[in-house]
């Protein structure tokens, strides 16, 4: 499923090509690209749920204290190793993520069928969430820079 999400993001969203609106046409395109029907449906559902996080009358998170900190569940810690959790904290500290977008990222990570996520894959999930979060264009650009810039020697995070 993650491969399909990456394919869609790189070939449609990130390249600024208009995404096919018709789900049947998109499914046919993905099938022609070599993806299996069941994985295509999972990926499309994942994207629909991402879009749903942005919709509705209520914000994704209500009533959070700015001085609170995130305690990860056992399942979240299995999916997101120390490096990934540290990177999420780093992104919050440098204001790329806020509490709401961090929780959206964790929500989307937990819906992936991967048993654990590596840091590089987490970065792409973060990019997808920020791309779909209205009003977070600057954070998206910062995250894009973090993904595509060449790492410098001695840097803590790339």
Curated annotation (Swiss-Prot):
Belongs to the Smg family. The lineage of its organism: Bacteria, Pseudomonadati, Pseudomonadota, Gammaproteobacteria, Alteromonadales. NCBIfam families: PRK03430.1 (NF002897). InterPro entries: Smg. It comes from the Bacteria. This is Protein Smg homolog.
């Amino acid at each position: 499923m993650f491969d399909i999400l990456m394919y869609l993001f790189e070939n449609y969203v990130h390249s600024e090509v208009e995404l096919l609106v018709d789900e049947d046409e998109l499914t046919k395109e993905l099938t022609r690209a070599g993806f299996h029907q069941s994985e295509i449906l999972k990926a499309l559902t994942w994207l629909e749920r991402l879009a749903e996080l942005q919709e509705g009358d209520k914000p994704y998170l209500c009533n959070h204290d700015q001085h609170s900190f995130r305690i990860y569940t056992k399942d979240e810690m299995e999916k997101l190793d120390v490096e990934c959790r540290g990177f999420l904290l780093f992104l919050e500290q440098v204001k790329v993520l806020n509490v709401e977008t961090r929780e959206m990222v964790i929500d989307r990570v937990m819906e992936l069928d991967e048993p654990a996520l590596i840091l590089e894959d987490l970065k792409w999930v973060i990019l997808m969430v920020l791309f779909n979060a209205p009003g977070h264009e600057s954070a998206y650009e910062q995250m894009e820079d973090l993904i595509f810039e060449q790492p410098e020697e001695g840097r803590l995070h790339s």
